[in-house]
A protein has these predicted regions:
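Function-determining sites in protein domains
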Residues: 2-10, 15-140
Length: 140
């Protein structure tokens, strides 16, 4: 009987450790991050503003061609994200992705992170699928 209790205790510990490891290594899709976003809408768009807190009007809209918008949205859709507790304060961009609804976020390019306005969650983009390189080319 003592052996069974020891074996069950060890089994529970192993399962708990496995669960914690799996939870820690969990990455999220764009649909998870944007809370059930529908990327299959007819005319998705992306609006990009640079953020410069030294100016009176801190947002400057950047005109993005439609083809580049499609590439950015597709790259974002295919990216993978990890939740993070880091809350950056020096944002580079304010982006709104319009799908079935508008999803506004702030981005920090060098840290490859974002902050969603809808729920104030912070994410690190672990596999950006060239999102930031496309964004950099589009904003030059």
């Amino acid at each position: 009987m003592k052996k069974i209790i020891i074996i069950l205790s060890l089994l529970i510990i192993v399962v708990a450790i496995g669960f914690l490891i799996a939870k820690k290594d969990q990455s999220y899709s764009a649909t998870d991050v944007l809370e059930n976003a529908d990327f299959n809408v007819k005319n998705p768009t992306i609006t990009i503003h640079t953020v410069d807190t030294d100016k009176e009007d801190i947002y400057t809209k950047i005109e993005i061609p439609e083809e580049t918008q499609k590439k950015l949205i597709q790259a974002f859709q295919n990216a993978k994200f990890d939740k993070t507790t880091i809350n950056p304060v020096d944002y580079d961009y304010r982006i709104t992705i319009s799908l079935n609804t508008g999803y506004t976020m702030y981005l920090v390019s060098d840290k490859k992170s974002l902050n969603l306005l809808s729920n104030h969650e912070n994410y690190a983009i672990v596999n950006d699928n060239d999102f930031f390189s496309i964004l950099e080319k589009a904003t030059k």
